[in-house]
Amino acid sequence: MSLNIAKDSKKRVVIVGGGFGGLKLANKLKKSGFQVVLIDKNNYHQFPPLIYQVASAGMEPTSISFPFRKIFQHRKDFYFRMAEVRAVFPEKNMIQTSIGKAEYDYLVLAAGTTTNFFGNKHIEEEAMPMKNVSEAMGLRNALLANLERAVTCSNKQEQQELLNIVVVGGGATGVEVAGVLSE
């Protein structure tokens, strides 16, 4: 497999990650004289500040997910490839992805964040992180399943356990989730 992008006379900027940083840079490079290649494991950009709305069923995933190809459909200097980066070879100006190798003149790593459990293995094993739409949908489905089971549960202690929710994390997402659940 290969990325199937012909090298032309323009210098190539490879951007790994289509979050806020990668998307902003790809937009800034419009008409800059560079060939821009965006690589992301998803074929869409997600709007993280509203992921809690997907988890709480306040919004659908399509409301906060925007296909890269649609965003950049009129760009002749832009290429998108859905892949994961496996290795970076700076001495060769090359990366290895899940679909092949890509050469670059400039490489920007904007792959985003990961959930920090601060070494707490119990939370890491039991928690449901919410960094993307898939995780938000998993949380939504778990919450709704527990609510449905609680409605038909005759044992009050079991019912309370099904309705007991712990939010770990006091950042923006944690506060938003706690707020929307309390409503």
Task: Describe these PLM feature segments.
Residues 2-78, 165-166, 172-183:
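Beta1-alpha1 glycine-rich phosphate/pyrophosphate-binding loop at the start
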Residues 1-12, 79-166:
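FAD-binding core/adjacent interface of flavoenzyme oxidoreductases
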